[in-house]
Amino acid sequence: MTISPPEREAKKVKIVVDRNPVVTSFEKWAKPGHFSRTLAKGPTTTTWIWDLHADAHDFDSHTTDLEDISPKIFSAHFGQLGVILIWLSGMYFHGARFSNYEAWLSDPTHIKPSAQVVWPIVGQEILNGDVGGGFQGIQITSGFFQLWRASGITSELQLYSTAIGGLLLAAAMFFAGWFHYHKAAPKLEWFQNVESMMNHHLGGLLGLGSLGWAGHQIHVSLPVNKLLNAGVDPKEIPLPHEFLLNRDLMAQLYPSFAKGLTPFFTLNWAEYGDFLTFRGGLNPVTGGLWLSDTAHHHVAIAVLFLVAGHMYRTNWGIGHSMKEILEAHKGPFTGEGHKGLYEILTTSWHAQLAINLALFGSLSIVVAHHMYAMPPYPYLATDYGTQLSLFTHHMWIGGFCVVGAAAHAAIFMVRDYDPTNNYNNLLDRVIRHRDAIISHLNWVCIFLGFHSFGLYIHNDTMSALGRPQDMFSDTAIQLQPVFAQWIHKTHALAPGLTAPNALASTSPSWGGDVVAVGGKVAMMPISLGTADFLVHHIHAFTIHVTVLILLKGVLFARSSRLIPDKANLGFRFPCDGPGRGGTCQVSAWDHVFLGLFWMYNSISVVIFHFSWKMQSDVWGNVTAQGVSHITGGNFALSSNTINGWLRDFLWAQASQVIQSYGSALSAYGLIFLGAHFIWAFSLMFLFSGRGYWQELIESIVWAHNKLKVAPSIQPRALSITQGRAVGVAHYLLGGIATTWAFFLARIIAVG
């Protein structure tokens, strides 16, 4: 018999809470800055309001006790979920109360989605455009209509019911947030029981969550969509509970339902192949993924995660221990490997958050790319405005999450990292050879920058000199993306070779036939050429520069040759004195600030590339003569010069937003103008010196004193860090809103 050493013993799952730890009281709400001794005294200068905003959610600065911080974060998560559910409920309510959903459902190829009707105040009703079916409203591009159809919603009453359900759930979340902070707050020990947490999140959240969704897809979505696709009037379609209770009704659509669970228990699972399919490709009626494929996918995911939910060792002595896994993770060149990482991840929520943000951001970017190649919902692919919006939205979300990951990794380094617990493990080894990492990364950025832009500059020069035969293009000197083309080809051939059971490849974008719905292209093979090769190297360049800035911020967060005691100065500090050749803009916070601008560069190039490529090579109308694309295939011809991007993309496609005045799209014209102003306003904060403003303020205060109208709260210029924060916020807001107006006015007008 083997006796386990004590550290191998299972961590018993115990519910450990503090009863009534914090009194429920509104007193604190009446005292702004109650969390800080200095702020609670009230304002003496205008800096107070900025510090209040900067520190209100920085729980680390309120108390250093993790036992106190953890339930605060936990409780805040419930509040966050409550806010999300109220927002979601609002979306469903708009669908029920102000939308043309039922009309759209009856004719999704000709009627456009709208869920907002503007009141006739000072002529604003001009925004209510004709979206078809006799409905006037603002065309929406959020994809909710397509999502609702995919989930089997056939009436506005169902949307009302779901909206009310969302509000009830929100109330439950707000109650839980209050209860788990004021009545029964979990102890730190509970948050640190990672094996139990992994089992519950993997098995419960992802496993049972996917299983529940698969059940809904099979019992509600599939029958409803099958009837809708066959042209049955939504009002004639049975209600969801009828499909659930009446097996004969289901068996008419899916014969295997008549056999019940017999095939499941006799392991004759192929019987269920009529509703759990493995077709691949898109449904030619709707232009979306086969819903029977996505139901199959969710069943498979559920099985996978239900197994994963039993993987970690808790009350029974079987399964993995997270600490053991991490400490076993070492190779011949990695020193102590991941020893010490378990302690980091159970005591630093910043480290935990950094990893989650990095993964979540990457996932969002993966989602952006799947949404157009494999549109998951019916009639999504032919709604070009929604396709462009969803791609752009998921790219921005991904970019912000990745920068947030670097921010919290740097906060971890400054506030939570303990060098004594991390001797010669992988983290320590990375930090010790950070100079080699950063200098190599810097070299890569310089190489990529000069070479990728160099190719464009060469083309612009040759074009200006009238020497098209000397340009890099598909018709002159070719730089074909051979690896990408090979990947396309491999995936296009997969159904016959590597995926023998699939009837079609995962996406028509790899190759094959055009999928058209109602005469519009849903998806078709996307050919790659020299122009794509060029812009992909710009992507490589901008992404590497973003990583350089963010990684340098993390690796040099605690110390550098310039400022060895950086850790003592904190996460954000403006400068460290005038000596040493300049010590400003070196804090970890400043690296996040600078990284945001390069993240913005990266994402802008990606969404511009996507928008133009799709309009040029994919989106358009199918006629007897073939496919007529929106911009007629000009991407390959024009996008290989910088001048082409400026003239044939930005300028040519801005005509719709610039000329939108007096039409239903005029709001986009105003947003385009206003957002440019917000962007320009940011430059006032970014290109200015604090001393200039302080001097100006003091002369204005002098004038007020002369007139005896001086305020009791002394005005002060923004600190350097505050100015930069205001600057970057307006820069990003202005830039994103400008892009939004430009994209939507264009695609709604021509798409």
Swiss-Prot record:
The keyword Plastid applies. The gene is psaA. Phylloquinone binds at W693. Chlorophyll a binds at M684, Y692. GO terms for molecular function: 4 iron, 4 sulfur cluster binding; chlorophyll binding; electron transfer activity; magnesium ion binding; oxidoreductase activity. Its main location: plastid. It comes from the Eukaryota. Keywords: 4Fe-4S, Chlorophyll, Chloroplast, Chromophore, Electron transport, Iron, Iron-sulfur, Magnesium, Membrane, Metal-binding, Oxidoreductase, Photosynthesis, Photosystem I, Plastid, Thylakoid, Transmembrane, Transmembrane helix, Transport. This is Photosystem I P700 chlorophyll a apoprotein A1. The keyword Metal-binding applies.
